[in-house]
Amino acid sequence: MKKVLAIAPYPYLPYFSGGQKFIAQFFHYLGKETDLTVISTEGNDFSLVSSYKAIPLLKKSFSRYYDRGLIKKITAIVKEGGFDAVIWEHPYYAWLAYRVRKRTGIKTFMHTHNIEYQRFKSTGRWWWPILKWYEKSCFNKADGIFFITPEDKLFAINNWKIDPARCFDLPFGVETDKFPADRLQCRNEVALKHSISSNDKIYLFNGLLNYKPNLDALKAILEHINPLLSKNETLAYKIIICGKGLPDSLNNLKDYADKNIIYAGFVDDISLYFKAADVMLNPVQSGGGVKTKMVEAIAYGATVVATETGAAGIEKAVCGSKLLITGDNEWARFTNCILNVEPGNPTPAEFYTLYNWEQIIKKLKLSL
């Protein structure tokens, strides 16, 4: 069994965002197939870990990102542990990763969740050109890079001339391996909890709401999509909004309670809501947005209506009729797609072959 060290630069347990959930589930399933040790921050609840060893070495404060004392500490851990490879989540610690490799010779992988500079450029950060240079340098030096999306991988290969032999797919995974049989039961449970009529369509939006791309998507629902839906006099529906971090200025969406909007806040079991939903709404127009939630929604049987930006990164060929895409800002077309969703269409089996965690880890092990 391979001995693998992984470094997560921020707290991910318990998880609240899609990125945190990705790391948590990736490590959980990787730990089942390798001898895994994870170094992360003191702010994690490692009592939730069951398949790997954890070391809370990184500081809680932002100074952890430039803590030069980590060079000696992680070098010692690598040498004493006899690890075969190290996986660094995100490129932020590239300066540290290659100093550790120089001292130990360990095979070094970067796990990138986005082309980071593009994400920060899209949200207006002035320093994106600096990050672009740093990120490109990081990719050039890595022994291997794991990409969430085929688009990101092709960008690195075509634009930054990264050797394709060093580029590997690592999509966001789902724990289920088949279309759920309990969707009706889950719908009834959610409907009872939120006083939803049996005749109502259930539309769902889920995401960390203090993340600007998600907040902008929520505003698109409130200001554009919902008003268009409400014009259809024969449509009975409710839109459930899930997620923590809603700004106080929106007052828990109380002003929209009489407009078919239900604010559920953070929910412990989001899979219940995915199974209950007829349609998941993904009107994201910048940044990373809700891509991870989109994969989960389709896995649990909901149909997703997404903008082009929102749908970027998902393997559309395996989604069948469970993914409908419109252009960004095309709210009339977006609304028409919602209205034209065919109820009851199953998720294709090919979707689970690609996105089930056990299948993902099986392929990933070959590259370590």
Annotate each PLM feature.
Residues 4, 101-120:
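Active-site proximal beta-strand in glycosyltransferases
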Residues 143, 275-289, 302:
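Acidic donor-binding loop of glycosyltransferase active sites
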Residues 293-296, 303-307:
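Short hydrophobic beta-strand element within catalytic cores of glycosyltransferases
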